[in-house]
Each structure stands twice: as C-alpha cells, then as structure tokens.
Amino acid sequence: MPALRSRTTTHGRNMAGARALWRATGMTDDDFGKPIVAIANSFTQFVPGHVHLRDLGKIVADAVAGSGGVAKEFNTIAVDDGIAMGHGGMLYSLPSREIIADSVEYMVNAHCADALVCISNCDKITPGMLIAALRLNIPTVFVSGGAMESGHAVVTGGIVRSRLDLIDAMTAAVNPDVSDADLDTIERSACPTCGSCSGMFTANSMNCLTEALGLALPGNGSTLATAAARRGLFVEAGRLVVDLARRYYEKDDEAVLPRSIASAAAFRNAFAVDVAMGGSTNTVLHLLAAAVEAGVEVTLDDIDQVSRSVACLCKVAPSSTDYYMEDVHRAGGIPAILGELDRGGLVDPNVHSVHAASLREFLDRWDVRGADPSPDAIELFHAAPGGVRTVEPFGSTNRWDTLDTDAKNGCIRSVEHAYSADGGLAVLRGNLAPDGAVVKTAGVDESQWTFRGPALVVESQEAAVDAILNKVVKAGDVIIVRYEGPRGGPGMQEMLYPTAFLKGRGLGPKCALITDGRFSGGSSGLSIGHVSPEAAHGGPIALVRDGDLVEIDIPRRRIDLLVPDAELAARRAEIEANGGYHPANRERVVSAALRAYAAMATSASTGAARDVRLITG
C-alpha cells in the first residue's frame, strides 16, 4: 500500500521545520496525515476564459476540506492566444504549454502533494496541465472554467446577427462592405461573457477531450461558464479527488491514476471523439504530446486510421454558423457524442474514468439519448445561456425548453446521418509533407477537397497577412507559410489572422494555405498545418518556389509539390551551399527563452514536445 507522498514533509522528528512552515499556512495537528490536494489554478485577468477563476479554487478547496483532505492552491500562467495573435506574442503560445506542465510538476513534487485538481480552460493551459498530470501520475481531476456564450448584435438596417464569435470580429475588420459602425457593434458583441471562446476552438476541444479521456466530469467540455449548473462540477471535483486519493493510498487501487485511466484505448476513444466533433487541429499536437507522458505509443498514422473510420457527427463554429458550444451542450455534450460512437461500434468500451468504472456505466447515466439517463444528466444538459454580458460565472439559471436529441438533423448526429463518412480531421502525406500534415476537414467545403494551384511563398505569418491585405494573393493561389514550425519560428505560430483575412476578403473558399506552423481552432477553410518535417529541419516545404504547382487531394490523403525530383535535389543543394535552412528575408528578435524551447523542440508530427536528448545527446 503506497504511503501518502506528503508524509515526507509532515512526519518524523527531522521534519519539524517543514511542519512549522505547514502550520504557518493554517494546517493543524489534525491535518497531518490527511491527503494534501494541490489545486492548480490558472486565474488571470488577461484572458476571458480565466478571468472568472479567482474564486473557483476556493469552491474546490472547501469541498476537499469537507471530504477530509487538505487543499493547497497555487497558480500557473495562461496565455490568451487571441490577444497574442498576429504579432510576436504568438511565438510564446505553444512554448507556454511546456512552462505550464513544468510549473505544475515543480509545485506538486516540491511540496509532495498527494493529489491534484486542475482548474484550466484555454488553449495551452489544459494541455499543459494534462501533460503534467500524466507525468506526475497521482490522483487527478480536471475541471475547466467553461465555454463563453455566443454573441448577438443588431447592425445597420436592423439586421440581426444572431450568433457571433471572435472570428466574426476578425473577418469583419477586413471586409470593405462592413461599415466602421457595424464593425464596432460586432466587436462589442462577439465575446459577451467570461469563458473560453464559444466555438469548437482549441480550448473547448481540449476541455471536451479531457472528458473523453476520462479525467474530467461529465459536462466539463460543454457546460457554459455562466451556467449555474457549472458550479456543481467544482464542488464534485473537490469531493471526488479526495475519494480517488483514499482509493489509491488506502486501498492500493491504481485504477484511479491518470495513466491507468488515459490508457491506449482511452486515447483511441479521445481521437474518435475529436474527429467526430471536428475538433481543432491543435488537439493532434496536444494529444500526441500527452500520450508520450502517458507511455502510450500514438502516431499520426493511428490518427489517420481513426479519421478514416469515424464519421463526422458534429459541426460547430468555425465549421458551422448554426452551432456553438451552447448547442453542443443542449444536444447532450460529450456523453452524447460518445453514445453515438458507441452505438456505431466506433469506441472501445473497455475504459474507465475518474467517475465511472466503465464506459457503459458512464453512458447509461449521462447519455441523454440513451434508454434511461439520470435526472442529473437531464438537469445538467438543460442549462442554457443567460444572454447577459458578464465576467462572472454561474449567473444563468436559464434552461432550454427541450433538449436537442435529433440524431438526423440536430447538432450531434448519429453515424447513420453523419455529415461525412470520414471524420472532421485528416492526416495528409506526400512529397511536400513526408512525415505528415493535418487539416480540419470539418471546416473545408467539399468543393475544395481536391485543389491545385500555384504557390505563393512567404516566410512569416506577418508576410502572409501583408500579401492578403495588399491583394497580392489571388483566387486559386496556394499560400505557403514556412519557417514557422516549432524550431523555425520558433514556437509554431497559429495562422488565425491569415485565414480570417482570407475569409474577410472573400478568398476563403478560393485559396489554400499550407504551413509548417499551425492553425487556431478558430480557423476554417483549406488550411493545412503541421507540415513535417518543417522547413528549419530541411523539410521539402523549404524547397517550394513561387509558381510551383501544389496539389491537394483530401480523399486520397495526399499533398504534393508537382516539381521533378531532380529539380528539388538541385534546389536543396543550392540552399545547403548557401548556409542551410533559414528564412532569407525575415527580421525577428528571438529571446533566450524561445531559443531554449527551440533547442529541444521536436517535430509537429510528434506533438512538438520537448526532447532533452536534443541537447544532452
């Protein structure tokens, strides 16, 4: 039977100094011997998805104390990708994932905590904490801040824009048909509440996937930040984590540990949910990196296999203008998607979670489309938006009149009535991306699933934006944005502004954008990222020249540069003779912190995680 990790600092004569310090935090004799639960919060006033988290740690802490544990809260950083977008700040976004993972590990191990509650929400925070939880492998529960409500506005002529999000503000900004007054109205209306942006962008995708992996409670991914019902998730997380700690430390039950829950089968199920719901392409990076910490061998080939066999059941903004996270919730959230996949034989039932001994037990209680869902499930998924601008959580007691259980035409469809037989994400390969590239097919009109056009090559996101706004980009072009990979950027910038500006100028369905960088979960259109190897590693994307024909064939999972091999070899020799693989005309200040990340960053095809062997040999 494992001893409490915290006994290292709370027991024995030699630990008098440590106990003295614990006492100074408010602990008493009765607390020594109870499980110490670390609460990793990520409150910050920089990020709407985190601005409301300040007091939520106390809700968890009170529940921990009431269940017989000792709660100790700390904070970690959180970068807002939307605010950091389009300038040098985006270089720091992906590297922050590693900083978050390290900071959680440092705090938990330095203080010998016994269990962990992760209060996350936005893009790199949930994956960073997930990496840490799997690395630490102590009883852990995830509970995120919840999704933002979609916006509403009335513009010139009394036209009602009934559903808005951040991307609408970006695209309107470059649309010459949108007046300054209407742009101002859209800007003020697009992000009306606290919470992670309202579509199936990276933050909400990852919060849904922690639920699918089994490390979060039902409803974690879809319950709005403003919903009163969300408060109960924080209370239950505090109660549950103490129960998990007791099962492990008092009963030697290793089934409660993150690596037991996030098994190979659980990761396959998570990828199935990901492609079924058309999640952000960033999820591929994050799940690959998390799988490394879980000791689970997952490759892009595995993801490709899932994407070919699992149908696209759900299209949410930015892939749709009809559905947002509040609609996913009304349709039953992740339990409903898992339920449809289970009925289609597309998930492995032999998995368990922090809250259920099996997938069947989970779905029997929480799938509102099942035979006999629990009253708790019916109550939770009726939670509706409040429609009031606020930065405070839990204020809405509004309820949907009915749930959306329409499996034919509703937000979440059955396998029989899927949007497409293939999933919402696909892995492409070819001579332009020998190690793979990723595209969110749920956001690509089927008319663009095959595309051929001349390359227009730029070597930074900023240059891509300039080319789009200055009308250098024409319909039919394939924009190549290179040297923006994990090492080449460094930091693998997101290309949200280029895709949003293409859309705003009416070129979204007429162009393709290919990069060794990545895309925001808010991107849509024929946007192919994670091209591997990246240009800085000598990948073929470094060899592309203006005017080269590029061919994309999503049904065949191909992406090819239509240039003879001999010509490509000659270009490679020329580059290597002139100093190797680096951008020719880019001025960018790269800090020591970013250089340190770049020195250890691996390929996007392996999650862009760090590998210390790159510097230690």
UniProtKB/Swiss-Prot annotation:
Residues annotated as binding [2Fe-2S] cluster: 122, 197
Modified residues (N6-carboxylysine): 124
Top-rank taxon: Bacteria
Pathway this chain belongs to: Amino-acid biosynthesis; L-isoleucine biosynthesis; L-isoleucine from 2-oxobutanoate: step 3/4; Amino-acid biosynthesis; L-valine biosynthesis; L-valine from pyruvate: step 3/4
Enzyme class: lyase
One GO biological process term: isoleucine biosynthetic process
PANTHER family linked to this entry: D-XYLONATE DEHYDRATASE, D-XYLONATE DEHYDRATASE YAGF-RELATED
Function summary: Functions in the biosynthesis of branched-chain amino acids. Catalyzes the dehydration of (2R,3R)-2,3-dihydroxy-3-methylpentanoate (2,3-dihydroxy-3-methylvalerate) into 2-oxo-3-methylpentanoate (2-oxo-3-methylvalerate) and of (2R)-2,3-dihydroxy-3-methylbutanoate (2,3-dihydroxyisovalerate) into 2-oxo-3-methylbutanoate (2-oxoisovalerate), the penultimate precursor to L-isoleucine and L-valine, respectively.
Protein name: Dihydroxy-acid dehydratase
Species name: Parafrankia sp. (strain EAN1pec)
Encoding gene, per UniProt annotation: ilvD
